[in-house]
C-alpha cells in the first residue's frame, strides 16, 4: 500500500468516526428534548403515570409555590400533589404550560442539561393569568433512557 492510499484510508476512517459521533450527539439531544416533552405533555390526572415514568429516583425539584422544594424517590408525585393542593386553595384552574424552543441542550456522557422558556397560562379566581418562566432540567441516561434527575421553574 502506498503512502497516498494509506493517508486516504485514514482520512476516510476519521471522517466516518467524526460524522457518526456527531450524529449520535444529535440523537442524544433529540432524546433529551423528547424526555422533557414526555414529562410535561403527560402532567394530567389521566396520564400522570407516563409523566412520572420519566422521573429518576431520587429527583430534586424547585418551584415557585410552597414548600418550594421536593426531593427523594417520590418527589415528582409529591410535587404534583402539592401543586394540585396549592391550585385548589388559590382557585387556580385551567393550567397549561408550553415550552418554547430550548435555549440550551448540553449532553456530556450520561448527563444532560436542558433550559427552555416556558409560558404558563391559567385562571385565578376566574381571571386569565399568563406567566413567562424558565424551565431548567438535569437528566441522567439510564438503561431505560433519559430520566429527569432535577428540575427548576422560575418566573421571569
Task: Please tell me what each predicted stretch does.
Residues 1-11:
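Bacterial N-terminal signal peptides that target proteins for export
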Residues 60-71, 88-91, 107:
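A short gly/proline-enriched turn/hairpin at secondary-structure junctions
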Residues 39, 50-52, 59, 72, ...:
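Hydrophobic pocket/interface hotspot
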Residues 26, 38-41, 62-69, 125:
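Second-shell loop/turn segments in exported
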Residues 11-13, 17-54:
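Short, low-complexity N-terminal intrinsically disordered segments enriched in polar/charged residues
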Residues 130-156:
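Short beta-strand edge/turn micro-motifs at domain boundaries
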Residues 77-125:
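Surface-exposed, charged secondary-structure patches
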Amino acid at each position: 500500500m502506498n503512502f497516498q492510499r494509506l493517508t486516504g484510508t485514514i482520512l476516510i476512517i476519521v471522517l466516518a468516526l467524526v460524522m457518526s459521533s456527531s450524529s449520535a450527539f444529535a440523537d442524544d439531544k433529540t432524546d433529551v428534548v423528547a424526555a422533557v416533552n414526555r414529562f410535561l405533555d403527560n402532567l394530567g390526572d389521566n396520564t400522570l403515570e407516563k409523566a412520572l415514568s420519566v422521573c429518576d429516583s431520587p429527583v430534586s425539584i424547585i418551584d415557585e409555590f410552597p414548600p418550594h422544594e421536593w426531593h427523594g424517590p417520590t418527589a415528582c408525585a409529591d410535587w404534583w400533589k402539592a401543586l394540585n393542593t396549592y391550585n385548589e386553595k388559590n382557585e387556580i384552574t385551567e393550567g397549561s404550560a408550553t415550552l418554547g424552543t430550548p435555549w440550551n441542550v448540553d449532553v456530556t456522557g450520561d448527563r444532560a442539561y436542558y433550559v427552555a422558556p416556558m409560558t404558563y397560562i391559567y385562571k385565578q379566581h376566574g381571571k386569565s393569568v399568563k406567566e413567562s418562566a424558565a424551565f431548567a432540567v438535569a437528566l441522567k441516561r439510564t438503561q431505560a433512557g433519559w430520566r429527569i434527575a432535577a428540575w427548576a421553574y422560575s418566573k421571569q
